[in-house]
């Protein structure tokens, strides 16, 4: 869970400059408050800042400025930006960063489904998890096969027969053998209901990962807005005052944006972990029932 949380946090921040600030804050606070018992927290902030820095370079944003269009950025740095890898920064008409967020979400959910399948098999046995195996085989296997087909690793003929075999095996597991020993017609009805819940649930879960792109985009646009406001102040024909107000606006704006971005980058990855991931991994929470009102003698 840790690597995915760091990646999600960094994508929500989406700015290499903010990553540097977080690392500097973590380093300063760790040196300043060595005996406070918060060393692990500052180390975590440092790791999150480091991931934010590298992901921010990959996404092409530095303190709200686009690295691709910046005159000060060297060519090797621009080559790291994913938007420059595709024409107009889009894949099939969609922003490449949005596609990246959805792809990472699919990977996250597939990992959860594999863990669910293995754990349920250990707990309940294979005979009671046939349907779970069918869905995992269909979704995870389908994604792998389609990816190999798109990369032309599989020929068109092989791709067709592998998809047919995958669909046939998964269909039998989901609709016919989902509960061995039960009436096949009941199994088919149960499989149809399970299919409805699975399709609608997975669609919502995958689309939920678009928030990684949306939060990063919002933070970048807000940072750019403060940059524009600061440069507009420089047009005031008062040599010293304009620079003072420009610096104040830039510092205030980016501090505010950093604080709001950190809040969103902390909350939303937690939601993706506790809702989308735990649900698809079959995690069942434990705990004591809350019962504050009791009779005492």
Predicted regions and their residues:
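Conserved, carboxylate-rich catalytic/transport cores that coordinate ions
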Residues: 1-297
């Amino acid at each position: 869970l840790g690597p995915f949380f760091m990646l999600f946090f960094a994508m929500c921040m989406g700015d290499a400059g903010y990553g540097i600030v977080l690392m500097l804050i973590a380093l300063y606070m760790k040196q300043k408050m060595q005996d406070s018992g918060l060393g692990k927290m500052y180390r975590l902030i440092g790791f999150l800042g480091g991931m934010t820095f590298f992901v921010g370079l990959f996404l092409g944003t530095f303190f709200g400025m686009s690295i691709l269009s910046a005159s000060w950025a060297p060519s090797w740095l621009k080559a790291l930006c994913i938007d420059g890898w595709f024409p107009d920064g889009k894949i099939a008409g969609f922003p490449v960063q949005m596609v990246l967020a959805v792809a990472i979400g699919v990977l996250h959910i597939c990992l959860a489904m594999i863990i669910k399948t293995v754990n349920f098999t250990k707990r309940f046995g294979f005979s009671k998890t046939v349907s779970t195996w069918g869905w995992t085989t269909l979704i995870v296997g389908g994604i792998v096969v389609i990816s190999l087909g798109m990369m032309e690793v599989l020929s068109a003929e092989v791709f067709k027969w592998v998809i047919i075999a995958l669909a046939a095996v998964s269909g039998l597991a989901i609709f016919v053998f989902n509960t061995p020993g039960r009436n096949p017609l009941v199994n088919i009805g149960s499989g149809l209901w399970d299919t409805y819940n699975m399709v609608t649930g997975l669609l919502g879960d995958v689309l939920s990962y678009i928030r990684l792109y949306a939060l990063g985009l919002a933070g970048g646009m807000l940072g750019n807005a403060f940059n524009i406001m600061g440069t507009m102040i420089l047009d005031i024909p008062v040599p010293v005052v304009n620079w003072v107000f420009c610096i104040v606006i830039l510092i205030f704006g980016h501090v505010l944006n950093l604080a709001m971005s950190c809040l969103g980058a902390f909350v939303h990855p937690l939601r993706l972990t506790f809702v989308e991931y735990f649900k698809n991994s079959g995690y069942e929470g434990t705990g004591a029932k809350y019962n504050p009102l009791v009779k005492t003698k």
